[in-house]
Structure formats: C-alpha cells, structure tokens
Amino acid sequence: MMRGASKRSISSAAVLLIKKNKLPPRPKFTPEMEAQCTEKFLHGGRGPGGQKINKCNSKVQLRHEPTGIVVECQETRSREQNRKLARLKLARELAASYDTMPSREEALLQWHRQQKRSQRRRSVAKYEQREEAARVEKEEREARDREMVRELFRR
C-alpha cells in the first residue's frame, strides 16, 4: 500500500494559480484625487528621527473629502517622502473602498499561501520518500539477516 495515496483528495473546484508577474496593478494617485484632497503637515510624535521629528512638521495628513478617508504618514524624516507615501496609501485605501478590481494585497496573500502550500507538499513528499527508502533498506537488512541465520543452522 502506498503511503501518500490515502491522503490525496480530488476536488472539482477550479484552482486559480497566481503568477508573481501577473498581479493586479498597484493603484495610482491621480490628479483628480489630488483635487479632492486636503493636506496638512503636523508635528510628529512617534517614529524614526528622534528629537528632530518632534520639532518639525514632517508628518503628513491627507483627507479625501468625498469619502472622508484620512491617511497619515510619518515613515521618514523627509516631508517630501512622507507626502509621496501618504498619497500611495490613500490610493490603496480608495481602491479598497471602491473595490473596483481585485486587490493587489489579496492577490499577494493568495500567492504567498500558494507558495507555502507548494513548499509543504514538496517537504512532505521528500520525507515520505526518505521514510520509504529507510523502510525498504531495513526490510532488505532483515531479509539478509534471516538468510544468514538459515545458512548458519543448515550447517
């Protein structure tokens, strides 16, 4: 009896495999979105940069007026980098709220799950193969030992 045969199951559901290079596009921050947003620069509180962060207005807060979505960003000490990152975050939030196309984050999560499943399958197959080889070797060794004992008692 094969060991892995009893564990297999066949499903009629179609499995959609995701390719890393075929992910949905990242949401873009458009000039129309820019016109609908208000931007504030705040004194920072937490984040990298130490005392300098507490003294300057590097924290960016974007508010999308039609939806009321507010995004804050203080990932770096640079105001310009924070502005860029805040716009990317807002575009992602708007895409998630409108749900017009499949989310890139969901596709990435599914891709990671798919990779883990594949890795697990390979690992299980590898260890089953090792187990089978060890079992066969043990049976051969026992058969040789039995044959040796028979030879000894025949004499």
UniProtKB/Swiss-Prot annotation:
Alphabetical list of Pfam families matching this protein: RF-1 (PF00472)
Any one biological process term the GO annotation gives: mitochondrial translation
Localization, UniProt: Mitochondrion
InterPro entries in the record: Mito_Transl_Release_Factor, Pep_chain_release_fac_I, Pep_chain_release_fac_I_sf
Gene3D superfamilies according to UniProt: 3.30.160.20
GO CC field: mitochondrion
Transit peptide, UniProt annotation: 1-17
Bias-annotated ranges (Basic residues): 113-124
Domain of life of the source: Eukaryota
Start-end of Basic and acidic residues biased regions: 125-155
Signal sequence interval, chain numbering: none
Keyword Cell cycle: no
Molecular functions per Gene Ontology: peptidyl-tRNA hydrolase activity; translation release factor activity
Start and end residues of each stretch annotated as Disordered: 111-155
Alphabetized UniProt keyword annotations: Mitochondrion, Transit peptide
Family of this protein: Belongs to the prokaryotic/mitochondrial release factor family.
Protein name as annotated: Uncharacterized peptide chain release factor-like protein YLR281C, mitochondrial
Source organism of the structure: Saccharomyces cerevisiae (strain ATCC 204508 / S288c) (Baker's yeast)
